């Protein structure tokens, strides 16, 4: 398993331990990708997982660009439409830098 997959596993386990439920993982469309689709009650939570090594450039929180946010929004909209889901949603980020995990609710 590569470091990105390990980071996604760690993020998923952390979110599940805090009461969220996994709906889908690694959802890919030609115009964007969703790392994790979770649910917290009725709310669909689209999660971007970012991983950086401690010696890497910057930390994981700084790694989500405006263009990536736009692609994730577009992919999430498509996911909701394809699955005929009419529910509130939000966009979270799990940033992992080395051993440190930071969960940012409503990241954008």
From Swiss-Prot:
Instruction: Tell me the SUPFAM superfamilies matching this sequence.
Output: Restriction endonuclease-like
Q: Where is the chain membrane-spanning?
A: none
Entry-linked Gene3D superfamilies:
3.40.1350.10
A Pfam family hit = UPF0102
Q: List the disulfide bonds.
A: none
Q: Domain of life here?
A: Bacteria
Q: Which GO terms describe its molecular function?
A: nucleic acid binding
Q: Which HAMAP family match?
A: UPF0102 (MF_00048)
Which family does the record assign?
Belongs to the UPF0102 family.
Name of the protein described by the UniProt record: UPF0102 protein Sama_3355
Q: Which organism is it from?
A: Shewanella amazonensis (strain ATCC BAA-1098 / SB2B)
Phylogenetic classification of the source organism:
Bacteria, Pseudomonadati, Pseudomonadota, Gammaproteobacteria, Alteromonadales
